[in-house]
UniProtKB/Swiss-Prot annotation:
It is an enzyme of class 3 (hydrolase). GO terms for cellular component: lysosome; membrane. This is Putative galactocerebrosidase. InterPro entries: Aldolase_TIM, GH59_C, GH59_cat, Glyco_hydro_59, Glyco_hydro_59_dom, Glycoside_hydrolase_SF. The lineage of its organism: Eukaryota, Metazoa, Ecdysozoa, Nematoda, Chromadorea. SUPFAM superfamilies: (Trans)glycosidases. Substrate binds at T87, W128, N171. PANTHER family: GALACTOCEREBROSIDASE. It comes from Caenorhabditis elegans.
Length: 645
């Protein structure tokens, strides 16, 4: 039996010495460490990885830096796409229409490539939205919803050769006991007996906790998932015997307090909440900087480079020196008297202690900040170890500094000085100091053009970030495939499928060939420039832009701004016939105060004067928009952009 004795003595400047004795002689208080991971999704957050690093060999470098077995992430959680907005954009569903299975969602490709780097990494999945054919809610027909979810797991197993470690219920929305029971049944019937169910998955779970602990339900699921808990887990939940995860956490701007938030949260979750696993949102900001929550992940990608963020480097202090399955020692973890925390991990042979003394202001998180507290300017910490015969000393690294070796004294003590706003490790292992990884992006062409010929069936178009509905490539065309509103996670009142792409030059032209098939329920197409429409808040802010809508049934053309509550600028009839079932080429661009609209290959353009107020409002907005006026199939080809001086 492994035994460890740790004594921690704090000597604070100018005050009497205080001693905090911790005596561990067995693993009776140890808990299994489930790992630190990240979420891909919750809004197509990894989408542009496949645009900027289109070659698999280039992506391998990126994913190696995030998931290598030596110091990478230990869990990967992905969104189960539902064709609807889920923060940064939509993720394509694997079954947008009942019985029509799509197997090339980019998350499947991401999982496959991550598993080539780390074949044993656990994969978890959670829906944000659901396709509309399921009903008004996921719980209208629990069997149908469970079968829909299990179909995703089947694709993973049968097509992409991975097993799903855990599956959630519905992101940050109410759960249903009857659905969870049915999901367990359907999982087992399809050979997924080992797949765990994560229940909860919400903010502010006061009522949810009592339901989760109901003796008639508590054995129907495996993990209690909590989002942004800040370590605040009720005592009865901590003592319930259920595994508790922060199944979504972090999401804090790395340009501000992200690094400190991560350092504090990693420890506080366990010390305050008995939380043994943490999954950070989001894996990478692989979306346009114009979209919300940019640089609130563990890495970022733009047209110039991939780069890891400091929050990930903090996390790597643990992932480099602690593995899933190690034990967290409850009685060897706690708070320093002068502020700050320490958590001890061990595998019975080696040990790692993560320490942090982050101040309140330097560790604020977007969602889970505590009440104000105070940390002493510096603290002298004396660790005392005994009953570990092979133990000679500890390697220490603080704040990404070089490693230092501290030999234990005759009485098995090691003394360190911890200033405020410090974080790092003491470990029996050689120290791997986290460092930033930067990988240059392959050259991105100045002008965009795509004929959609070199795609797998149902692969998602590059560069475009759908914000409502979903585009996939089929037979050389980008198809908006959603025919009815989804069970929405946000933007539930929006009935306009649309996608956005950032443009690189101010004076830009958008060209597209578009067909609305005869059988489609879509009635019009929309092109837009100088827009800021993205994310979940478009209804609140009434997102802006300069948009052109062409109705196929009556040739009516409407120019408008303000996407939700439209401000009409002009209306007129197109000069040429526009029919369903035929492709037409459309172009729009803005020159000074004039919007030019071009139909087909004709040289004649229609010019509309844009009011100065609308020009001023959209002057700094840089998103192109494509879409349809309502749900229904539309086909897009030869989309391109040009710019002029």
């Amino acid at each position: 039996m492994f035994s460890i004795f740790i004594k921690i003595i704090l000597i604070l400047p100018s005050i009497a010495t205080k001693t905090n004795n911790i005596d561990i002689k067995s693993w009776r208080s140890a808990q299994t460490f489930d790992g630190f991971g990240a979420v891909s999704g919750g809004g197509a957050t990894s989408k542009l990885l496949f645009t900027y690093f289109s070659e698999k060999s280039d992506r391998k470098q990126v994913l190696e830096s995030l998931f290598n077995k030596d110091n990478g992430l230990q869990l990967l959680k992905v969104e189960m796409g539902g064709d609807d907005q889920s923060t940064e954009g939509t993720e394509s569903s694997h079954e947008s229409e009942k019985g029509k299975i799509s197997k090339n969602n980019y998350e499947f490709q991401l999982i496959s490539e991550v598993r080539e780097i780390n074949p044993t990494i656990p994969i978890c999945v959670l829906p944000w939205a659901f396709p509309g054919w399921i009903g008004n809610t996921p719980y209208d027909n629990v069997t149908e919803t469970a079968e829909y979810v299990v179909n995703w797991l089947k694709i993973g197993r049968d097509t992409w050769n991975f097993d799903t470690f855990c599956v959630g219920v519905w992101n940050e929305r109410n759960f249903s006991e009857s659905y969870v029971k049915e999901l367990r049944k359907i999982l087992n019937l399809n050979g997924f007996n080992e797949t765990l169910i994560v229940a909860g998955e919400g903010f502010r779970m006061d009522d949810s906790y009592s339901r989760l602990l109901d003796k008639r339900f508590i054995n129907e699921y495996d993990i209690i998932g909590v989002h942004y808990p800040g370590g605040r887990i009720p005592e009865n939940v901590q003592k319930s015997g259920k595994v508790i995860w922060a199944s979504e956490d972090y999401s804090t701007d790395n340009r501000d307090t992200g690094e400190g938030c991560m350092a504090r949260t990693m420890n506080w979750n366990f010390i305050n909440g008995n939380i043994t696993g943490m999954i950070s949102w989001h894996l990478m900001s692989a979306f346009y900087p114009q979209l919300p929550w940019y640089r609130c992940g563990l890495a970022r990608i733009d047209e110039n480079k991939f780069q890891t963020e400091k929050a990930f480097h903090v996390l790597k202090y643990i992932t480099s020196h602690v593995k899933r399955g190690w034990k967290i020692l409850r009685e060897s973890s706690g708070r320093f008297d002068g502020g700050g925390t320490y958590v001890t991990y061990t595998n019975g042979k080696d040990s790692t202690i993560f320490v942090e003394t982050m101040s309140y202001k330097k560790s604020l998180c977007e969602y889970s900040s505590p009440r104000p507290y105070h940390v002493k300017p510096s603290q002298l910490i004396r660790f005392k170890f005994s009953e570990i015969p092979s133990f000679q000393g500890l390697n220490m690294s603080l704040n990404f500094g070089p490693s230092k070796f501290f030999s234990k004294s005759v009485n098995s003590t090691i003394t360190i000085l911890l200033p405020v706003n410090s974080f790092g490790i003491l470990t029996t292992l050689p120290v791997s100091t986290p460092k930033r990884v930067t990988i240059k992006t392959p050259l991105v062409p100045l002008n965009y053009h795509d004929d959609f010929e070199n795609y797998e069936f149902d692969e998602e178009p590059k560069f475009w970030m759908p914000q409502k509905g979903s585009w996939v490539v089929r037979n050389g065309r980008a198809v908006q495939k959603v025919t009815r509103p989804s069970i929405s996670w946000c933007t539930s009142h929006i009935r306009t499928p649309y996608a956005v792409m950032a443009y690189r030059k101010k004076n830009s032209i958008l060209n597209a060939e578009v067909n609305i098939p005869k059988h489609s329920t879509a009635k019009s197409i929309i092109l837009g420039i100088r827009s800021n429409c993205s994310g979940c808040d478009i209804e609140v802010i009434n997102c802006r832009g300069i948009f052109v809508e062409i109705e196929f049934s009556n040739k009516k053309v409407t120019i408008f701004s303000d996407f939700v509550d439209r401000s009409i600028i002009a209306e007129f009839k197109a000069r040429r016939k526009v029919e369903f079932g035929k492709f037409y080429k459309f172009s729009i661009h803005l020159l000074d105060s004039h919007l030019f609209i071009k139909f087909g290959n004709h040289h004649v353009m229609t010019s509309v004067e844009i009011p100065e107020e609308q020009l001023n409002k959209t002057n700094n907005d840089t998103l192109f928009v494509i879409g349809t006026g309502n749900f229904g199939i539309s086909e897009w080809d030869n989309i391109s952009t040009d710019y002029f001086h």
